[in-house]
Amino acid sequence: FEFNCTAIEVQVDPETGESAWSRWVADGRTRVTKRSDFRTVNGVRFAFLEETEGETARQAQTVTWENVTVNAGLDDARFARPSASASVVRLPAGRKATDWLAVDLHQKRYVYLRGEVNGVATDIVLDSGAGMTVLDGALAKELGLRVEGELEARGTGGNVGAGIVSGVTVKLAGMEVGPLPAAVIDLSGVGRRVGRPLPVILGKEIFHALVVDLDYPGSRIRFLDAASFRYDGPGRKLDLIPAEDGHKSLRLAIEGGEPVVVGLDTGQGGALSVFRHYADERGFLSGRPVSERRGGGVGGATTMKVATLRSVTIAGYELKGVPAAFQATDVRGAFDTKRQEGNLGAGILSRFRVLFDYGRACLWLEPGADLGAPFPKDKSGLVLGWADGALAVEFVAPGSPAAEAGWKEGERVAALDGEPATAEWGRVLTRWSEAKAGTTVRLTLADGTERVLVLKEYY
C-alpha cells in the first residue's frame, strides 16, 4: 500500500499472522526490516528482534526487546502537559521575552548571532531547516565533548555521518538553551562555500520552544515566551504545515499556479529551490535563460540549474523576478523528495520581519521597505572558495561573464576590486550581486595579473 509518497510492502504468514519482513520505499530510498525471535505474550505474538537495513551502513539498526507488556494500561500522568520547568529553554528571570539581539546577516541572508556554547564565545547560525543543533568538529574538540555513536545526517548535498554529543548548553540574548544533544559534523566545507565558518548551527529546537521574532530588515532578533505571546502587528498570517521530523512547510504560488508546499528554511541562502518533479511538471526550465551554479550544504557540493521566475506569491505578497535554483541530479539529499515542491530560503524571507509561532502553526510576515526591490543575482558567474589562506575559483557558470572571459576552475585570486582577498571575500560578491548590469569589476590573480569582468544578468 502507498501513502504520502511512501510505498510499504509487508510479508505476512497466512497461518500464524506473523509479519517477519517489510520494505519501505520513501522518495526512492529503500529500507528493509526483518523480524525474528517471535514470542507469545498474553496471547499476542511479538518479534523480540528487529533488524533494519537501508542504503548505507549508517542506516542499519538492530532493536532487541527485553520486556513486552500487553494491555497493562497507562498512567494518566504520562499524558500531562510538560511543566515550564521541563523546557530546554530558560528566558531571563521574570521575563516573557529577551531584549533585541543584533543579527549579522552574512551576505544579507545567513543569520549569524553571537553567543556562548558551554562557556566559549562563538558565532551561532540560526537554521530552521536543521533537524537538531550541530557543532563543527573543531569546536566539539575544543569543548572537550566526547562523541558517542553515529547517525546519518541528510543535507542538501547528500548524506554524511554525524557523531552525537550530549550536555550542550547555548547562551544568547540573555537566555539559556539546553542541555541539548547535538550532532557533530565537519562543517569546514560548508563554511568555505558560504564564505564564513559555521562553528554552531542552532536548529529547530529553538523554534519549537519559543516564538522567534526575526526582523531581517532591522538586522535584529528576539525570543518570546510562546504561551503568553499574542500578535497585534500589521503583518499577514501564513499557516504552517507539519513536515517530516518536526520541520515545517508552508504554501506559496509560483507564476500564478496553484499554491504548493515548500519547506521553511532560514539556513538556505537562496530565495527558492524548486524540486525536480515540480519543475518538470510546470516546465520552468523551458523558454527562459538557464545557467548553473555550485552550491550545497551538509553532505557536500551539488550543481544546480538556475533561472529567474516571473513571480512568487507568499501570504498574498507578490514578488517579481525571483532567482531560483532547480535540482539537476538526485543526490539522495534533503531536496530529493516528492513530499514537497520546493524549499523557501532566506532570499525571500529576508524581505520581511518574520515571527515564527510553531505552537500556533503559523508565521506572521511584515514586509520591509525593500519588498519590491529587484532581487540580487550573481552577475559574474564565479563561485569562489576560501581554503588554506587563499581564494580560488571552484566553479564557472555556463554563459556567464566569467565563462566568456575564459576563467578556469582552480585559478587563485589575490584581490577583488583592489581589496586583498580575505576570508570575508563574500561581502564583495554580495556587493557585485546588487550592482547594475554593465558594472566593471577587477580581479587580481596570484601572479599579479589583473582581469576585468563586465557584470551582466545571464539567467
Positions of predicted regions on the chain:
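Pepsin/retropepsin-fold aspartyl endopeptidases
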Residues: 7-15, 19, 23-26, 34-459
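Exposed beta-strand-loop-beta-strand "reactive/processing" segments of non-cytosolic proteins
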Residues: 1-2
